[in-house]
């Protein structure tokens, strides 16, 4: 009888130890899964700084690791191109560390204005910013959103210049060009490096229109393709047609003066 009790006790002890081991293993596995989930979240957040968050989410969800698995799609997109007026002269006057701080503040404020109006920043080009509206998701109001973003950028620069003045730094001026057209949107590049981009003459024309802001002495210019999508609340001035490099026909643009305010808000 004593032997049977002893054997039963040993069996129960073995079962208990096995249960404890399984519980320990389950707890350890749960910790490992939690750690892996946190690492994945951090990785996605880091990648979202290099590519639009919507693209990163799709890559993860679809397990895409080759460019060919997510081919570019033909889309109609509104492109916004902006850069700093007089950047070269400013970069020669300021210490490199100060210049970097000024640029970072500029990029952050401009990016915020773009994101708040359903756009996404594609890339920074020196002091330039290239952004798209309607590239990631269909957006019937993409052109109006782009112009609202440009007006928000104008206001943000005015606020930033007051801050720069308090620090004894020169004010920034910007020129913004906006154009709407067709092209291919998707992942472009090699196996080693790829980026989400929009390929087509739309981007080139947006950049050319931006350069015309200096010619016409204004800060925001849009093409006829954009103007045709805007409602009467936007106040525009037609500019003389100009020939630009790479475009066969003279380009007609419109300067954006502002926009009527929605009820209860200030005008742009």
PLM feature spans:
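Catalytic NTP-binding/metal-coordinating core of nucleotidyl cyclase/transferase enzymes
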Residues: 24-27, 31, 41, 66-148
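Alpha-helix/helix-capping structural signal
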Residues: 54, 85, 182-183, 225
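Catalytic core of nucleotidyl cyclases, primarily class III adenylyl/guanylyl cyclases
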Residues: 82, 113-145, 159-203, 231, ...
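Regulatory cytosolic signal-relay segments
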Residues: 3-74
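Cytosolic regulatory/linker segments at or just downstream of nucleotide-handling modules
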Residues: 183, 206, 213-268
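A generic structural signal for short hydrophobic patches within well-formed alpha-helices
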Residues: 56, 87, 130, 226-230
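Conserved, well-folded catalytic cores of nucleic-acid-processing
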Residues: 62, 153-156, 160-163, 191, ...
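Short amphipathic alpha-helical segments
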Residues: 60-61, 104, 108, 206-210
């Amino acid at each position: 009888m004593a032997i049977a009790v002893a054997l039963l006790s040993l069996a129960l002890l073995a079962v208990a130890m096995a249960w404890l081991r399984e519980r320990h293993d389950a707890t350890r596995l749960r910790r490992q899964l939690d750690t892996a989930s946190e690492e994945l979240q951090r990785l996605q957040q880091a990648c979202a700084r290099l590519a639009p968050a919507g693209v990163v989410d799709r890559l993860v969800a679809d397990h895409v690791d080759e460019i060919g698995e997510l081919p570019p799609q033909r889309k109609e997109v509104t492109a916004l191109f902006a850069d700093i007026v007089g950047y070269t002269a400013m970069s020669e006057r300021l210490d490199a560390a100060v210049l970097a701080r000024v640029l970072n503040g500029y990029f952050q404020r401009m990016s915020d204005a773009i994101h708040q109006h359903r756009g996404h920043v594609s890339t920074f080009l020196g002091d330039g910013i290239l952004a798209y509206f309607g590239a990631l998701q269909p957006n019937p109001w993409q052109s109006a959103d782009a112009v609202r973003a440009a007006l928000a950028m104008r206001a943000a620069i005015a606020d930033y210049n007051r801050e720069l003045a308090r620090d004894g730094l020169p004010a920034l001026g910007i020129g913004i060009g906006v154009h709407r057209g067709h092209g291919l949107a998707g992942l472009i590049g090699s196996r080693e490096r790829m980026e989400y981009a929009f390929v087509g003459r739309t981007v080139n024309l947006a950049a050319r229109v931006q350069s015309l802001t200096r010619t016409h002495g204004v800060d925001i210019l849009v093409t006829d393709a954009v103007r045709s999508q805007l409602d009467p609340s936007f106040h525009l001035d037609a500019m003389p047609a100009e020939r630009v490099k790479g475009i066969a026909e003279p380009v007609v643009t419109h300067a954006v003066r502002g926009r009527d305010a929605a009820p209860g808000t200030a005008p742009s």
